[in-house]
Regions:
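N-terminal glycine-/serine-/threonine-rich phosphate-binding loop
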Residues: 9-52, 56
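Mg2+-dependent phosphoryl-transfer enzymes with acidic/Ser/Thr/Gly-rich catalytic loops
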Residues: 13-22, 39, 204-289
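Residue-level signal for inorganic ion chemistry
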Residues: 29, 49, 84, 169, ...
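Active-site phosphate-binding/coordination module
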Residues: 38-141
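Hydrophobic packing residues within well-ordered alpha-helices of enzyme cores
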Residues: 42, 67-71, 181, 185, ...
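Short active-site oxyanion
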Residues: 51-57, 76-78, 168, 227-229, ...
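Short, structured coil segments at secondary-structure junctions
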Residues: 73-76, 83-84, 188-190, 244-245, ...
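Conserved acidic, metal-coordinating active-site core of Asp-based
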Residues: 119-232, 236-241
């Protein structure tokens, strides 16, 4: 992709100089383009971040194994926030995790089954720390699950898997989940937190789990302040990232709720918006000895 200069509407609000230590970016709809591809310049730009002493930390609803598979060696030394904040790691070190109870996971599975029986075209993923499980195995649903879960196992009955280490129950609705099955799912398991993470996905996690909470854990682990943190997002499961970063960027393609929460805007994910803005932030970043 040809490098394009940032338009004045993106540049004008930015501080002239920043002390930047941590850049956190969502994946789908944010870093990844409209065809599901990682930016070709990611290795180059992340190398420049590291040379400047800035940590690069992807934060996604995706599974940890999927993040590592999709991003490859570029994140070998990066902290990763996975499963919409329910898990944060750095290498083999677990920095943070939040799980839901076996009873909550079972109720979520049962509710999704009831919705499917009543005509909703939904499928369920039960995400644990090392593997994710599905019981629906038709090609259409399997293709969607495999986009986000590299370590994926098909079972006959989700109720038979160990439910005591569940990070997230994710439900995929082939229709618009925000205006469809999400309300019934949220009402059926009120003790869990629900977040629409895209047009078709809803995540059911611990009420304590969020990308923002995982970000706070990373900041504590590395001694980084909110004013030294930049975040990029596009959808509602990114929302509380903005509470913990002074440099909060909404993609121009973001949900209205994200645009309202963010102090700044970046070009769309289809326009290499994250990397173009990161390069500008690097130019404005205060040099440190």
């Amino acid at each position: 992709m040809k490098r394009l200069p940032l338009e004045s509407e993106y540049l004008a609000p930015l501080p002239a100089e920043i002390d930047l230590r941590l850049i956190v970016t969502d994946m789908d709809g944010t870093l990844i383009d409209g065809d599901g591809r990682v930016p070709v310049r990611l290795d180059e730009v992340v190398a420049r971040m590291r040379e400047a002493g800035i940590i690069f930390a992807p934060a996604s609803g995706r599974q940890l194994a999927n993040l590592r598979a999709v991003l490859g060696h570029v994140v070998d030394d990066s902290p990763l926030i996975a499963e919409s904040g329910a898990l944060a790691v750095h290498g083999n070190e677990e920095i943070h995790s939040d799980t839901i109870s076996a009873e909550e996971a079972g109720a979520a599975i049962a509710t999704a089954r009831e919705l499917a029986s009543s005509g909703y075209d939904v499928g369920t993923v039960v995400a644990c720390k090392r593997c994710a499980y599905i019981e629906r195995s038709d090609p259409a649903f399997l293709a969607q699950a495999r986009l986000y879960y590299a370590a994926l196992e098909i079972v006959d009955d989700l109720m038979t898997i160990p439910l005591d280490e569940v990070l997230k129950v994710a439900v995929f609705d082939f229709d618009d989940i925000e205006n469809g099955s999400s309300q019934a799912l949220a009402a059926a398991v009120p003790s869990v937190q629900t977040a629409v993470s895209g047009l078709h996905w809803m995540d059911m996690t611990s009420p304590h789990a969020s990308k923002g909470r995982a970000l706070v854990a990373l900041q504590a682990r590395f001694g980084i302040l909110p004013e030294q943190t930049a975040v990029f997002g596009d959808y509602l499961n990114d929302l509380d990232l903005y509470e913990h970063a002074d440099l909060g960027f909404a993609m121009s393609n973001a949900h209205p709720g994200i645009r309202a929460a963010a102090a700044f805007t970046a070009p769309a994910n289809t326009e290499d918006g994250v990397l173009r803005m990161v390069e500008e932030l690097l130019r404005r970043s205060r040099r440190r000895d």
